[in-house]
Amino acid sequence: MAKISRLPDTVANKISAGEVVQRPASVVKELLENAIDAGASRITVMIKDAGKELIRIIDNGTGMNREDALLCVERFATSKISVVDDLDTLMSLGFRGEALASISSVSHFELKTRQAFSPLALKFRYEGGALAEESEVSGEEGTSISVRNLFYNVPARRKFLKSNATEFRHIFESVRSLSLAYADIEWRMYNDDEELFHFRNPDIRERLNYYYGSDFSEGLISITEENDYLSIHGFIGKPGMLKRHKADQLFYINRRIIQNRMLSQALQQAYGELLEDRQAPFAMLFLGIDPSRVDVNVHPAKLEVKFEDERSVRNMFYPVVKRAVQLHDFSPDASFVPDQGVQGESIQPEDEALNRRLMYHERPGRMATTAELYTDYRQHSLPQSSGKEHGPQSRQGEFFSAHEPLERWKKEGVEPEGDEVFTTMLQSRFHDDESAAGGGTEPKIWQLHNKYIICQIKNGMMIIDQHVAHERVLYERALDVMNQNVPNSQQLLFPQKIEMRQWEYEVFEEIRDDLYRLGFNLRDFGSKTVMIEGIPQDVRSGTEVTILQDMIAGYQENASKLKLEKRDNLAKSYSCRNAIMAGQKLSLEEMRSLIDNLFATRVPYSCPHGRPVIIKLMLDQLDRMFGRT
């Protein structure tokens, strides 16, 4: 007698359901995709007990005749494909013909459907995958599917479901991702008989504001890019918009929601140092690609895809997002928010004033570009033009040598590329802009406690942390110098000797080539001793020994804790140790030079470690604080 036997369909469907139907949200996703594929222009979602008691999806799509209605609950019965080659032209969301068979096998399943020309709807009821009832009833055009008592006959699976709050969150995220992708569809959702939303208008921003909070969409950057291989459109958000996690990164391929590590990493890298540790920026990005160039049949829930040429996709996706990030003003606004105090204690007005604290929040309103913020500063902080013309890279002070990439490229024959092309374009917008709008003859720039630089802008003030601003300037300059391999060193009149401990000398040996590229001219003097004979232009004479020692220590610390790339690590260590410090008094010329050099950088809004460089305090905020509104 044979030991191997063919499993009955009811058993096979239950096993298959383990892959396709992992939780109530899986059912919702599959049923919604079927409704969309059926051409629905109106979809209603009804949930009870987090999907354990009831999941009902109602659509006004094309409906089905009796033959199709019976076949749709059979395994591997589908109208989407008939031969393997059909996968190369597939644009529908569903195609395998597994979902309804799996769902009906682990629930009390009811399907009601009517085509436009039929006087009555067809109703089919299944118990554990077996047809229990068939009848004709009255009903609207389209299809209604009800899934009751999910996993009633698989108690082990039902036992492992999470709390209602967790399961409903997953359901809500499934509905959210599809309602955002298909804004042309009218969506309505109920939870335990309470209406959550009813989206009548195809306004994607209205939906974003509902899902993420009032005015959320006002802080988004729109992206649109297209070539013969790939199209990209959608939105990305400011760093720190809410406390985001990667569930708020929505990637779509041909309007199919997917999870893709490469796209997520490229997005993260495009934001770079603008993000703090464990931050993930918001994104809702739609990629359009020839379906023959992407395989959607690699995951049971169709959440993952495989690109024919992943490198080409990344090589287009990354610079598009990075360019959008660099073009916009990411400086946070400051708001003064009173502490709530201890419950049960009254706070007197004077105590309330003393207990105000400076907080960061994302200010709603149209996103400003870097160019606009810099132009605003020049118009309202600087006096009327006196004939001298300055760009953001042209001023010099005691601590800030000029950053002149255009002249450097001309002299050295270096072709600008990547970020430098963008920087050049940005600088061309700043140049020759000495507006008289600011009025007066005195620059409206001040230093506060030898720590912060305050500048007047059109509708308020801009506050700059002088240390991290200079750190950003030095960081980008150090990376540029090392990557171009054109050392710029100034020789010391009196070389300095530095004796190193064993670990310091080992680190020095590891980074000595890049130290040379950076501008340090160093010579071995024997017995772990090094002579400093030349230093970078940005290093002040007399500080070279301390800076080199601090750089080596900082490099070692970063290598062990952050595991940074070698040159990035060195540039961070160099800029942090060499930047002007809080408490250092600056002249007006030095402050202007620092601001000009800051706005010549690629990312002026955060230091290399992710801290903010610029904060804006707007007049309307001050007016509210003084009771003027």
Curated annotation (Swiss-Prot):
Cite the GO molecular-function annotations of the record. ATP binding; ATP hydrolysis activity; ATP-dependent DNA damage sensor activity; mismatched DNA binding
Q: Write out the GO biological process terms.
A: mismatch repair
Which key words tag this protein in UniProt? DNA damage, DNA repair
Name the domain of life this protein comes from: Bacteria
Return the GO cellular component terms, semicolon-separated. mismatch repair complex
Q: Which PROSITE patterns match?
A: DNA_MISMATCH_REPAIR_1 (PS00058)
The answer to whether keyword Cell inner membrane applies is: no
Q: Which family does it belong to?
A: Belongs to the DNA mismatch repair MutL/HexB family.
Q: What does this protein do?
A: This protein is involved in the repair of mismatches in DNA. It is required for dam-dependent methyl-directed DNA mismatch repair. May act as a 'molecular matchmaker', a protein that promotes the formation of a stable complex between two or more DNA-binding proteins in an ATP-dependent manner without itself being part of a final effector complex.
Name this protein carries in UniProt: DNA mismatch repair protein MutL
What organism, scientifically named, is this protein from?
Chlorobium limicola (strain DSM 245 / NBRC 103803 / 6330)
